[in-house]
Amino acid sequence: MGKYLDPRADLTFKKIFGEHKHLVISLLNALLPLKDDECVESIEYWPAEKVPDRPLAEKDSIVDVCCKDNKNREFIVEMQMTWTDSFKKRVLLNASKAYVAQSKKGDDYELLQPVYALNFVNENFMNDVDEYYHYYHLVHDKYTDKVIDGLHLIFVELKKFKPQTFSERKMQVLWLRFLTEINENTREVPAELLENAEVSEALEIVERAAFDDAEMRAYDKFWDNVSVLKTLENARKREIEAAEKAKAEAEEAKAKAEEAEAKLKQEKFETARKLKVMSVMTTEQIAEATGLTAEVIEGL
């Protein structure tokens, strides 16, 4: 095992961003769509009982850090190791719960503060677009400057991220490089990461030497569970694909059979018409020859 552990794991991610307030503040300011006067200045972590419950099947694939700032804005930061079709809806549900939980009976609705859900996803889920950063919020369909400030959902597809030089988004690039480039195989850390005080501190936190044996067992178990969940999810997807393929093939076979039946029926009609015009056979004989009823033949 190398010098560093993967920062995306439950143990490491929470140790970095769940125990060091200034680092999660830096991450939020770098990744959230905040204006200059909206930057996060201080935060308090949510108490354990407030953190959303996870479905049993997803408990080992989701890492989260939850907090609120001095303006009472709520922040849910998640690292999603495997993608499921229900993930976006679950993110929306948990953000909505956090928003509703602010309201107390008799309170002024103006006191409600926005909720930001920042989600790092380790699998691509929008394969038809190149961008890695996806921001959803409540905006007027026609007048896009008209916004209802309440729920802000951000999804970052880590596999799509390519390190480039963005001077206006320097910290965003540095944090994403940290999350995508640092792992157990890292032998040499890029100078840009070491030169930044906050990222350099995060690097020290994920050094292998900083973890005891019990923590390493938990770390290894996390990745084992992720592998199992990925295997199960891939198997589920294959089953769905196989079922959809079988359904499509059955529908195609049915359509071909119906087409062949309609063609055969039309041929019988044409044969019956010709025989009727020739007047060489009785209606009963034509019916016997074509399989059509006498009533149908009479109507031709």
Regions found by a protein language model. Give the residues of each.
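Long, highly charged amphipathic alpha-helices
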Residues: 26-27, 90, 174-177, 201
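Hydrophobic (often cysteine-bearing) scaffold residues that line and stabilize catalytic clefts
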Residues: 20, 24, 167, 235, ...
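Generic alpha-helical structural context detector
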Residues: 14, 29, 96, 177-180, ...
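Short, charged alpha-helical interaction segments and adjacent helix-coil junctions
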Residues: 75-80, 173, 180-300
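Extended serine/threonine-enriched, polar tracts that run as long, contiguous segments within proteins
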Residues: 150-173, 181
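Short intrinsically disordered coil segments
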Residues: 94, 132-138, 169-176, 222-223
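Accessory alpha/beta interaction modules
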Residues: 1-152, 162-164
